[in-house]
Amino acid sequence: MTPTTLSHLRKRKQEKHKFATITAYDASFARLFAEQGIDVMLVGDSLGMTLQGHDTTLSVTVADIAYHTRAVRAGAPACLLMADMPFMSYATPELACTNAAELMRAGANLVKMEGGAWLCDSVRMLTERAVPVCGHLGLMPQSVNIFGGYRVQGRDQDAADQLLSDALALEGAGAQMLVLECVPAQVAKTISEALRIPVIGIGAGRDTDGQILVMHDALGISSGHMPSFVKNFLAAEGDIRAAVRRYINDVEQGLFPADEHTFN
């Protein structure tokens, strides 16, 4: 199987061919996802909640992410694999380089960091050292204590303008991709159209270049409250493989997210 690269995703954006991505944490699910057609995966710090049982992602370490990155890479050797940089693992550009190197050695193709224009020095330093970066704006789970909870971001004009400014700054610093989480659909559309790099949405409407879901949400096995922007694809299909194929199809056809999964 030909490995998926960032060049493939840039081409999809140019051709307006939407793509589905998902979180993965082990070799078995990574292999299953790859066999159904998922070719971009994220080893997310969401594992702190989905696997470790915590209320936030803040307890996750670089060693945790590296361990699961190695497992996912073993199961999906051809996928484009993103790895989250955990809380405080990129507080300085130098620290970001040290920790990103560990994740790249574990099998990641790029690292994802949460934050706006303040991250530009780190993004620039990593890019110059051959570490591709995916930015993350909007709702940033590592900032839950600043936000006061998990809330939609960018609903007023000033906040929306700041998101666009941060997105352009990250792209200018060398970011190769961007995740937008829990922002109004029109804001996400504006940002996606303004950037040359692929934009992946989660709770950001259907006009981003790609979509991502936490696998536990997509399969309806998350405990507690299910966010309004997710869909349980397993409920209708009754089979994990069929559910993943439905997720891919619905994203590619623009059927997911639907209006009920979108913020205005």
Curated annotation (Swiss-Prot):
Cofactor binding: number and manner: Binds 1 Mg(2+) ion per subunit.
Involved pathway(s): Cofactor biosynthesis; (R)-pantothenate biosynthesis; (R)-pantoate from 3-methyl-2-oxobutanoate: step 1/2
A Pfam family: Pantoate_transf
InterPro entries registered for this protein in UniProt: Pantoate_hydroxy_MeTrfase (IPR003700), Pyrv/PenolPyrv_kinase-like_dom (IPR015813), Pyrv_kinase-like_dom_sf (IPR040442)
Residues where 3-methyl-2-oxobutanoate binds: 45-46, 84, 112
Gene Ontology molecular function, alphabetical: 3-methyl-2-oxobutanoate hydroxymethyltransferase activity; magnesium ion binding
Chain positions recorded as Mg(2+) binding sites: 45, 84, 114
Gene Ontology CC, one term: cytoplasm
An annotated GO BP: pantothenate biosynthetic process
This protein's UniProt keywords: Cytoplasm, Magnesium, Metal-binding, Pantothenate biosynthesis, Transferase
Cofactor annotation: Mg(2+)
Enzyme nomenclature, EC number: 2.1.2.11
Reactions that this protein is recorded to catalyse: 3-methyl-2-oxobutanoate + (6R)-5,10-methylene-5,6,7,8-tetrahydrofolate + H2O = 2-dehydropantoate + (6S)-5,6,7,8-tetrahydrofolate
Active site: 181 (proton acceptor)
Similarity comment: family membership: Belongs to the PanB family.
Assembly and oligomerization: Homodecamer; pentamer of dimers.
Task performed by this protein: Catalyzes the reversible reaction in which hydroxymethyl group from 5,10-methylenetetrahydrofolate is transferred onto alpha-ketoisovalerate to form ketopantoate.
Name recorded for this polypeptide: 3-methyl-2-oxobutanoate hydroxymethyltransferase
Organism field: Edwardsiella ictaluri (strain 93-146)
Name of the gene encoding the protein in the UniProt record: panB
